[in-house]
Amino acid sequence: MVDIILASKSKVRKEILERNGISITVEPSSVDEDIIKKALLKNKATPEIISKNLAEIKANKISLKKTNNLVLGADSVIDLNGELISKPKNRDDALKILKKLNGKKHYLISSVCISKGGFMIWNYTDKAILTMKDLTDKELEIYLAKITDEALYAYNVYQIEGEGRNLFSKIEGDENTIMGLPIKKIKEYLNSHK
């Protein structure tokens, strides 16, 4: 399979790609996501549009420097009734987010973009629907105490392939999408463009 640059520092995305036989080099794109999100929200962009735009901006930024390579950018956001929920900045923020999601259904949206020479050549967005159990504050605090800082910031508050699975009464959708990378569609694209 083709070598690709992953424009992300996400260890989980790297592991998903490698586990699926995709040879990658990691080169995180240092874009200021908060500024981009604020600008898009000001223009009334949906969480899905924000996710798509961030994935594309990340991929394009690196592909402008590495013009002969395919560059994969990715982004995941939570959509709670149209409200964009971003990654927590610290554990207190994570607890606030979990309390907001507590007992409710939300969408986890993951977008991927492949760029070459500064231009998007392919993109895909997938959604999963997650329904969180109605948990006590103490149960949420116990969950947060069990996970590492790295997991906390990398998984949109919950680590679905680990302890986070226990937070949910219902999970609909691809687990790889929830972990931030709809790998089946990426593989389909790469296999059809060898």
Where are these regions (language model features)?
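GST superfamily/GST-like fold recognition
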Residues: 1-22, 104, 127-194
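N-terminal polybasic phosphate/anion-binding patch
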Residues: 1-70, 84, 138, 142-145, ...
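Short, solvent-exposed cationic patches
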Residues: 17, 107-114
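Amphipathic, non-transmembrane alpha-helical scaffold segments
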Residues: 51-52, 98, 176-179
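Generic enzyme active-site microenvironment
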Residues: 73
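Active-site-adjacent loop/tail segments of enzyme domains
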Residues: 76-106, 132-134
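Short beta-strand-to-turn element immediately C-terminal to the catalytic PLP-Schiff-base lysine
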Residues: 79, 113-116, 170
